[in-house]
Amino acid sequence: MIGECISAGELAEAVLIVAHPDDEILWFASIAEDVGKIVICFLDDPETPDLADARKRTLKEHPLADRIQCLGLTETCSFGHADWSDPEPASSGLRIAATGEVANVYEERAAALRTELAPYIADATHVFTHNPWGEYGHEEHVMVHRVVSDLAASGSTRVWYSNYASSWSTGLMLRYCGR
């Protein structure tokens, strides 16, 4: 709803759910230190094996480490695998144009996220997460938004997100305008 605000007390009880370590700062720097809990979904990236250890060290030293919980799921390697010229929303987030393993892993991770995120959303009144078009067009951001929104719809949890978009994600963003 346009014009609604969230109080400082409500923000302190809110949950921030992001796909990757650093998304909490890149997309939510203005509220990250004010929310009660930060949930990071993915940790390992099969395309960059050393990244998980570096991310673990960084999360341990993060200034907000006391409120960060990392689910530790492995990334899907789906970035750039949706058809962004004609993006097709799906129950997992987006239809992945690539066939085979990437599409299967994307579906599997969405199912895992539904299970892992359900308790966080069931206990929350307000959740901040990625927008429906994945900011600049990141398939895993779209997935996280879809899972969070679907879980929130079954209760009274309010979902908040930014309006950032890029030329890559504008087509999908325009599908949500006027809702």
Where are these regions (language model features)?
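Active-site rim/loop-helix segments in enzyme catalytic domains that contact anionic ligands
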Residues: 1-123, 153-154
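A conserved mid-domain beta-alpha-beta active-site/ligand-binding segment of alpha/beta enzyme cores
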Residues: 108, 112, 169-179
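Acidic/His-rich, metal-assisted hydrolase cores and their charged scaffolds
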Residues: 141, 151-158
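Divalent metal-coordination and catalytic microenvironments
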Residues: 22, 127, 140
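Short catalytic/ligand-binding loop motif for oxyanion handling, primarily in non-cytosolic enzymes
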Residues: 47-48, 76-80, 135-138, 145, ...
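Short, well-ordered beta-to-alpha junction loops that form the rim of enzyme active sites
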Residues: 73, 129-134, 138-139, 163-164
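Charged helix-capping and loop-helix junction motifs
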Residues: 55, 141-149
